[in-house]
């Protein structure tokens, strides 16, 4: 939920995403509210500009020592963040899309993944795990995944183009889709 913040109108009230068109000062104050409510105050709050793609960014010394302008550029088109930097709070924004958190318990690496249908059909989770493996030696058996809430099957309808994109990429359609005769959609 987004209650208890400073934003007005469409962004009411606890919007923390700076890429929405909300007032910058309201976003800053909302971020302050969130950070001050956490058990341990983060040193960094990292929020990417998501594009429903599959790109993952590792938040490490390169990012942390970059200028504000460089950081802004690095966060463009990113739908997953990975880090093992202490005090670094990685964030994603979702509405209908699915938030997924990953934790590599052996290497103390975390990831936050924004999984919309476009990212899912193009294996964003696999790309994120591959990047964790390449960078930190993450093994799947050591990863704990937490899948957050998103839109339900009954509320999310798609046309043939989305169905076909998943089918062509090898997804088991009997398990993830349902034909709705009344609307002629899945």
Q: What are these model-predicted stretches?
A:
Residues 1-186:
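Active-site microenvironment for binding and transforming phosphate-containing groups
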């Amino acid at each position: 939920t987004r209650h208890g913040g400073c934003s007005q109108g469409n962004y009411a009230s606890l919007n923390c995403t700076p890429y929405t068109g909300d007032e910058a000062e309201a976003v800053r104050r909302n971020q302050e509210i969130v950070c001050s409510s956490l058990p341990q105050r983060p040193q960094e709050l990292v929020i990417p500009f998501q594009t429903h793609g599959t790109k993952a960014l590792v938040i490490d010394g390169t990012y942390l020592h970059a200028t504000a302008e460089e950081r802004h550029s690095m966060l463009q088109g990113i739908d997953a963040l990975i880090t093992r930097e202490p005090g670094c709070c990685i964030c994603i924004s979702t509405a209908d899309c699915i938030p997924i958190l990953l934790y590599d318990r052996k290497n103390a690496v975390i990831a936050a993944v924004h999984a919309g249908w476009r990212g899912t059909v193009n294996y964003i989770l696999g790309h994120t795990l591959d990047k964790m493996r390449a960078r930190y030696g993450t093994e799947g058996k050591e990863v704990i995944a937490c899948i957050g809430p998103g839109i339900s099957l009954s509320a999310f309808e798609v046309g043939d183009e989305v169905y076909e994109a998943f089918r062509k990429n090898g997804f088991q359609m009997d398990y993830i889709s349902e034909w709705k005769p009344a609307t002629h959609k899945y």
